[in-house]
Amino acid sequence: MAAISRRDFLQKSAAVVVATLGSTVGPFVGLSARAANAGPKFAAQNGGYGPLVAVRDLRDGVERLFLPEGFQYRSFGVRNTPLTEEATLTPGRHDGMAVFSWKQGKVRIVRNHEQTQPNPVGAFGDLGHAYDPAAPGGTTTLEISPTADAVSSWVSLNGTTFNCAGGASPWGTWLTCEETPNGVDQQRSFLIGPNDPDDLTYTQKHGYLFEVPVSRGPGELEVADPIVAAGRFAHEAAAVDPGTGDVYMTEDDFAYASGFYRYRPPNRPDEDKRIADGGALQILGVIPPGASEPVTMDLHADQAPGTTYRVAWIPIEVPDPEFAPGLSNDEAARVVFQEGESKGGARFSRLEGMDYFDGKIFFVSTEGGGPFDSDPPPNGSAGFGGGYGQVWMYDITNETLTLVFESPGPDVLDFPDNITVSPRRKSVILCEDSSAGNMLRALTRDGLIFDFALNNVASGVDEFSGATFGPGGQVLYANMQANGITYAIWGPWSNGLI
């Protein structure tokens, strides 16, 4: 089997990796500032795992992934294959997901489907239980053995749209996020091509957070209720503070600056086993040194890794706006953020994946770290930011925000998206969403990068998404989005830094 690495796919960057993860960074205690002397810092021996090699899929023998030697995987839940528990084909565009312990040693996965384009038959699954029969997104639930050699599957939410990332709750639910506010009052999506109809005929407002119980079994689909007080914007990911039930949320407005939000439910979700509507939405603002109030700052550029800010949480008075006739897609997407920005809310580039660990929220800015950018970018097509990615950390107890990593170039880290913390406290796993050679990569507690998995399907163009560890931390689950494949990956974790 031929060995392969990231450096075989992309030209090495001459930039310098600077990574600072101080003693406040949860599982990364003891990490000190690093400045490379001659170039990027990659973990020795690829994080202890050695080079990546082509590995056959235990499902059918096809070599879909490159992994460190000794690791195995099985694919399942593939797009357009029949769901086992109902007469529906598996939807595509697999994205964020979470894995929960279930009965008889099995696990349940609740998985997003980031489908957005008009669907000739509307929502997948039972239209009678769809939130919006015209909307093609939602979630499926899969019940599997830990290594996916036995699978059952069904629809657990339908009639939503652009279900991107999300997050697991401590009380056994999946929070799924709609990444567009297009709806009955703003039909024209930026995703619609020139040959598509002007009207998508949405019947409901969109751009919300929804909650899906992992206990929802086959035949138990219900019409979903959005948590409208958690905001109507381009939701990306969610993470829950188990101590308070507060929900932290990222926004990915692609061509414009985005915000980092907190929703404070009016109930105790850990007691009610659900998040109630009617709470308070807030946006994060940073307080510069010497100041006493938050000041609107651009955090996508000119930020040194290791920089820490005090923060303030700014109330959003109109979390669920109605869009006036004639409002453009871009204008509609920015309504909630612009209220927060006008009050001192921080400006980030494309906030995407997020994970809670040990009192800290780690979240990703996909195109942060570049030169200062404008709203929208001058070329009109690239995302706001122009960088290769940042990793931020919010300390809940100390109410501080720290830039813990910034990629200097595509050979180091290229457009990170979803993120998950290793249960062994050694690293975070990052899903790349770039144009070629996409990988699962690890950022260690010493600020070093190494490769863990390389896509060998469709010439590596397809992005990884939804990476998350199962109960016990021995199996890593991840999706290949456009091809619509889910993987269960396991092997000798103790050999290296994951």
Located regions from the model:
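N-terminal secretory signal peptides and thylakoid transit peptides that target proteins
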Residues: 1-17
